Amino acid sequence: MYGNKKRVFISFDIDHDEGTKTMLANQAKLADSCHISIKVNTSDTTLNIYYGDIFEQKGYTAISVNEYFDSELGEPVSEHTLHGMVIKKYFGGHPESFDSAVQTDLQNYSYEEVERTRGNKKKYSIGTTAKVTANEHKFLLFALSYTDIQTLKASSDLSTMIIALHGLFKRSRESTGGEKLNIPLIGSGISGVGLPATQLLQLIILSIIDETKKKQICKVIDLVLHKSRFDEIDLETIKRQWV
């Protein structure tokens, strides 16, 4: 009887080892499916796409905002958007310090003065990009969406997004100084471009490649996807299409 127990124990041990190997293999496979790299032809630019926290990356981080570069949390800027998170986390939630950083950088940019009951009154063109820093964190804030001055609701669409990306990449060429550019899944937030996550990603990839072929943006661009998009975006499919 003791021998039988011993054999059962050994058998369990072997199964456990095999299970561990399988688990590690699955984890390795998962890791591979969570990160891909695309080498842009005719350039030395590498585009990395992976899941992670956009705010933990080194280099410049692109954040979409509305055309007023609003700074008041709640309305018109939700603290749950990346725009709101920047104000809350890196400017202490203080509109004044955020406004000061933006206005200092955009002092030579043209704008339209608009009377609003709430929010900033300087309206900039879509694609206008402000380079701002908060301690060691560096941001490129670019105007992606229009704001209804009555409801304060932000909105965008496909053609507007393309114009906004062009403005972002133009400023990136001038400002990053060879440092990495980090880009989230632009257009997936409350601005509501109206495309599924995979199509948004494809559009951003295409825009980066097209702009890079015209003139290099920077050597390394990271497209950082939030983990909540894992079930929506199959990076293996993206890899087969672009790599």
Residue map of PLM features:
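Macrodomain-like recognition of ADP-ribose-binding/processing modules
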Residues: M1-V243
